């Protein structure tokens, strides 16, 4: 339906513009005989001005028409939404979203803090071995001594444990800063 109105309006403006242009020509140059095609125009600038004027008039009329169509469409949309107001209100209540900015930022900051605390607690409790308690793991390591390399294996295990303990203490003592 809109396209029919659009085409009809466009046709009316074209016909009106051509009538105005024809009337202007007859008013400015009243001739008793038709001009031949080979006859040169007296002033080419005058012809360009007429052409620009008619194009400007058409563009102006066309933009006014489009503005009025937009206004009509907007009024029609307002009337339709007023009629269906209850349906729209229910739909918006069902799918109402939370505020994007602050709520999401606060939740993500909270979740990051919780994840860091859980990771530190996991490191303190299990140090990577969830299956065995600390005492059982050390007793097993001492029971698996070999003649060659037992001292170096035992020493590296102790050093690893000390390094892990120092790292965990450092993590616990340093404050977690917020990302910005």
UniProtKB/Swiss-Prot annotation:
Region described as Disordered: spans on this chain: 25-58
Tell me a GO biological process for this protein.
Answer: negative regulation of apoptotic process
Task: Please give the InterPro entries that the UniProt record associates with this protein.
Answer: Glucagon, Glucagon_GIP_secretin_VIP
Q: Does the keyword Secreted apply?
A: yes
PTM description: Proglucagon is post-translationally processed in a tissue-specific manner in pancreatic A cells and intestinal L cells. In pancreatic A cells, the major bioactive hormone is glucagon cleaved by PCSK2/PC2. In the intestinal L cells PCSK1/PC1 liberates GLP-1, GLP-2, glicentin and oxyntomodulin. GLP-1 is further N-terminally truncated by post-translational processing in the intestinal L cells resulting in GLP-1(7-37) GLP-1-(7-36)amide. The C-terminal amidation is neither important for the metabolism of GLP-1 nor for its effects on the endocrine pancreas.
Q: Where in the cell is it found?
A: Secreted
Q: What name goes with this protein?
A: Pro-glucagon
Organism listed in the record: Mus musculus
């Amino acid at each position: 339906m809109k396209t029919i109105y659009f085409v009809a309006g466009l046709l009316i403006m074209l016909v009106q513009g051509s009538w105005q242009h024809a009337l202007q020509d007859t008013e400015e140059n009243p001739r008793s005989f038709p001009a031949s095609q080979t006859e040169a125009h007296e002033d080419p600038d005058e012809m360009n001005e007429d052409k620009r004027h008619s194009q400007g008039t058409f563009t102006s009329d066309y933009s006014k028409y489009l503005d009025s169509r937009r206004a009509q469409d907007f009024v029609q949309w307002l009337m339709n939404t007023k009629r269906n107001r209850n349906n729209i209100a229910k739909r918006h209540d069902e799918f109402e979203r939370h505020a994007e900015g602050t709520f999401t930022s606060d939740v993500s900051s909270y979740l990051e803090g919780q994840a860091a605390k859980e990771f530190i607690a996991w490191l303190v409790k299990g140090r990577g071995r969830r299956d065995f308690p600390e005492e059982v793991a050390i007793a097993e390591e001492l029971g698996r001594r070999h003649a060659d390399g037992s001292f170096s294996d035992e020493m590296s295990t102790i050093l690893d444990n000390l390094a892990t303990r120092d790292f965990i203490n450092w993590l616990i003592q340093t404050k977690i800063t917020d990302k910005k």
